[in-house]
A protein has these predicted regions:
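Short, intrinsically disordered, mixed-charge
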Residues: 11-20, 57
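Conserved lysine of the Walker
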Residues: 48
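Post-Walker A alpha-helix
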Residues: 51-52
Length: 177
C-alpha cells in the first residue's frame, strides 16, 4: 500500500539523516527500567517484543516502559550513550518521545536460559544484521564509525532464552551493572 511505502521511505531517509547527528537506528525493542534503557535485538520473529513485554509483566507496565518496540535510535552525548524513541515502532506501534541512558545491548536467541557478555568482534556481525545499511559509501562509513564507538563503550550481551520470568530476571541481573 501507499502507506507502507511511505513508512519505508521516510524511515530510510530518517536513518540517513540521523547519522549526521551521530545516531544509528537498530532493529530492536528498548525498555526503560529505573531510568536506564535495555535494548534487545534479534531477527524478526525471534521474540524481542515478547521479551520486553515480559519485563513489563515482571516489573509492572508503569516501571518498565517501552521506549520503542522496533527501531530506536542510539546516540552518544557528552555523558554517554542514549536510546531514543522514534515513530518507527513496527506493528505494535509502541514508542515514547524521550531519551534514556543506555545500559546495554542484548542480542537475543531462542534457547535455554543463559547470557554472557561478548566482545565487539563477536557483536559487530550480529548488530550489523539488525541495521539499515546505507548504500552510499559516505553514509555507510559514518554508520560504521558510530557503531565502532558504540561497541567499544556499551556492553553487549548474547542471550539464549525462553518466554519466562526467569529469562527476565537473568537478563536484568546480568545487564544492570
Amino acid at each position: 500500500t501507499c502507506e507502507k511505502l511511505e513508512y519505508v521511505y521516510v524511515g530510510a531517509e530518517f536513518n540517513r539523516k540521523i547519522l549526521k547527528y551521530g545516531g544509528i537506528m537498530i532493529h530492536s525493542s528498548a525498555v526503560e527500567v529505573d531510568g536506564k534503557a535495555y535494548l534487545f535485538s534479534a531477527p524478526c520473529g525471534t521474540g524481542k517484543s515478547t521479551h520486553t513485554k515480559q519485563w513489563q509483566k515482571y516489573f509492572g507496565a508503569d516501571q518498565a516502559i517501552i521506549i520503542n518496540d522496533d527501531k530506536p535510535v542510539l546516540r552518544r552525548l557528552e555523558d554517554g550513550w542514549y536510546a531514543y524513541g522514534t515513530p518507527f515502532s513496527g506493528k505494535t506501534d509502541e514508542n515514547v518521545n524521550k531519551k534514556v541512558k543506555l545500559q546495554g545491548i542484548c542480542m537475543l536467541e531462542r534457547g535455554e536460559n543463559r547470557i554472557r557478555q561478548i566482545q565487539p568482534a563477536e557483536a559487530i556481525p550480529l548488530i550489523l544484521q539488525q541495521t539499515i545499511r546505507p548504500k552510499n559509501e559516505k553514509y555507510l562509513g559514518k554508520m560504521m564509525e558510530i557503531m565502532d564507538q558504540l561497541l567499544r563503550e556499551v556492553p553487549v550481551y548474547r542471550m539464549q532464552c525462553d518466554i519466562s520470568e526467569e529469562a527476565v530476571k537473568m537478563s536484568y541481573e546480568a545487564m544492570k551493572g
